[in-house]
UniProtKB/Swiss-Prot annotation:
Name of the protein in its database record: Acylcarnitine hydrolase
Induction statement: Up-regulated in liver by di-(2-ethylhexyl)phtalate (DEHP).
Record-linked PANTHER family: CARBOXYLESTERASE
Protein source organism: Mus musculus
Enzyme Commission number(s) of this protein: 3.1.1.28, 3.1.1.-
First and last residue of the signal peptide: 1-26
Length: 561
């Protein structure tokens, strides 16, 4: 697919979706206008007929699960939503949370920005969407899957992900939720005046809402699985370790994101709070005055501050995270739920370097400048610059060829950011509860004219296979083989949501990850693999820390002398 085709296809898909919605909403039958109760009032949804199936889906959009987090509730935990009288309209997508859409332009995705810009944006954004089979009713007790979107905790929205096909194909309830992003979601003063992690508290509030209400929509509150990708996977993993979220769900799926992702968790709020104070003109204040000053800023002023953050970390706040996730994972009283954890085989292949603005730098890597590039990279990884030699030895060896060096660099970054953290979390969890691990390996055919030919399964490539559609429910030109892979992946995910085990008759067997380190290679022909990246894991978790310790010891000795 060329960039031009992608542009035309995005537009056609978007307007096609609108026409479909308008057409179905126009039908005036009781079934076309479903009304359901919630603990705060009644909501009316729509009936959607899913193309190529005889089945219908009831959608309920923009349901509030918390009070608008504005005024005194900015930088405060979410509060229960206000009740309403009459029947609330649940046929329009909610406003997305405040975010910097210019990031998409900078990433060379103006079409995506154009589409997102057609949706309203507001600080009042704590809403969720529900997709449920049209036959479902109270007492249906269907499994529930709650999707948490990714986007580095700074960008994204619930409505980009259409749960209709997953709902229809697997006869379950899909919920997509929103949460505060960027500064509004994760600013912290590091004390009682603004502890932070507001976005995670929003997600927990949405999960509490699901517990209280999902039975009215045909869902089983005792069979809730949370799933998400990238920062959404990090969110899922964070709820698995947080004592505040215990009992709100029964299974977890982490796609290319866990609580140990290096850029999305921080011991201290200092760097973010200092930057925010400086940019907002609220400097030289104690934390109480800083929070008061920031609450007085307009949405436009907050957006301007958000622009400097391409990602933002959650913080060890003493409440949502009583200790660092690594300590929580290792603690005796850790009680995880059964989990699917996985990565793609080219996580840093294309889209992340483009979004982060490092694609040109990678293209310029040669043997001559490699040492300097690795020194800079080591510093960004918070490693001593002296570690650059070890990185070179492990990933590049004596290779002279520039393209090979560039590919090895992206493998190194993918391992550091995604693969190693995912394997570490899987190893912590598997001694307490079942873990099913996967590596997604299929490069989608519809991207072959958009991306460089060496890119394999890039970050987020598995999402359309799980939802059987691209953003906003747009149908993809899957090949027959891809159609089968998508059906299998939906079935694995749904089986797991239903029983805590992805396996069933007719599917290639997916073994639990035990001490034999088995995992599933998710490809056109799925196969069982063993000990994914065991050598790299050894390097990052044993060799490198040992080298850093030796360096520190010799520096300390040198200082004493």
């Amino acid at each position: 697919m060329t960039r031009n085709q992608l542009h035309n296809w995005l537009n056609a898909g978007f307007f096609g979706l609108l026409l479909l919605l308008i057409h179905v909403q126009g039908q005036d039958s009781p079934e076309a206008n479903p009304i359901r109760n919630t603990h705060t009032g009644q909501i009316q949804g729509s009936l959607i007929h899913v193309k190529d199936t005889k089945a219908g889906v009831h959608t309920f959009l923009g349901i509030p699960f918390a009070k608008p987090p504005v005024g005194p509730l900015r930088f405060a935990p979410p509060e229960a939503p206000e009740p309403w009288s009459g029947v609330r309209d649940g046929t329009a997508h909610p406003a997305m949370c405040l975010q910097n859409l210019d990031m998409l332009n900078e990433a060379g995705l103006p079409d995506m920005k154009m589409m997102l810009s057609s949706f309203p944006m507001s600080e009042d954004c704590l809403y969720l969407n529900i997709y449920t089979p049209a036959h479902a009713h109270e007492g249906s007790n269907l499994p529930v899957m709650v999707w948490i979107h990714g986007g580095a905790l700074v960008i994204g929205m619930a409505s980009m992900f259409d749960g209709s096909l997953l709902t229809v194909n697997e006869d379950l309830v899909v919920v997509t939720i929103q949460y505060r992003l960027g500064v509004l979601g994760f600013f912290s003063t590091g004390d009682q005046h603004a502890r932070g992690n507001w976005g995670y508290l929003d997600q927990a509030a949405a999960l509490r809402w699901v517990q209280q209400n999902i039975a009215h929509f045909g869902g089983n509150p005792d069979r809730v699985t949370i799933f998400g990708e990238s920062a959404g996977g990090t969110s899922v993993s964070s709820h698995v370790v947080s004592p505040m979220s215990q009992g709100l769900f029964h299974g977890a799926i982490m796609e290319s994101g866990v609580a140990l992702l290096p850029d999305l968790i921080s011991e201290t709020s200092e760097m973010v709070s200092t930057t925010v104070a400086k940019l907002s003109g609220c400097e030289a204040m104690d934390s109480q005055a800083l929070v008061r000053c920031l609450r007085g800023k307009s949405e436009a002023e907050i957006l301007a501050i958000n622009k400097v953050f391409k990602m933002i970390p959650a913080v060890v706040d003493g409440e949502f995270f009583p200790r660092h996730p690594k300590e929580l994972l290792a603690s005796e009283d850790f009680h995880p739920v059964p989990s699917i954890i996985g990565v793609n085989n080219d996580e840093f292949g294309w889209s992340i370097p483009v979004v982060m603005g490092s694609a040109q730098m990678i293209k310029g890597i040669t043997r001559e400048n490699l040492q300097a590039v690795l020194k800079d990279t080591a510093v960004q990884m918070m490693l001593p610059p002296e570690c650059s030699d070890l990185l070179m030895e492990e990933y590049m060896g004596d290779t002279e060829d520039a393209q090979t060096l560039q590919i090895q660099f992206t493998e190194m970054m993918g391992d550091f950011m995604f693969v190693i953290p995912a394997l570490q979390v899987a190893h912590f969890q598997r001694s307490h509860a079942p873990v099913y691990f996967y590596e997604f390996q299929h490069p989608p055919s519809y991207f072959k004219d958009v991306r460089p030919p060496h890119v394999k399964a890039d970050h987020a490539d598995e999402i359309p296979f799980v939802f059987a559609s691209f953003f906003w429910g747009m149908k993809l030109d899957f090949t027959e083989e891809e159609e089968l892979l998508s059906r299998r992946m939906m079935k694995y995910w749904a089986n797991f949501a239903r029983h805590g085990n992805p396996n069933s008759e007719g599917l290639p067997y997916w073994p639990v990850m035990d001490h034999d380190e088995q995992y599933l290679q998710l490809d056109i022909q799925p196969a069982v693999g063993r000990a994914l990246k065991a050598g790299r894991l050894q390097f990052w978790t044993k060799t490198l820390p040992q080298k850093i310790q030796e360096l520190k010891a010799s520096q300390d000795k040198h200082r004493e002398l």
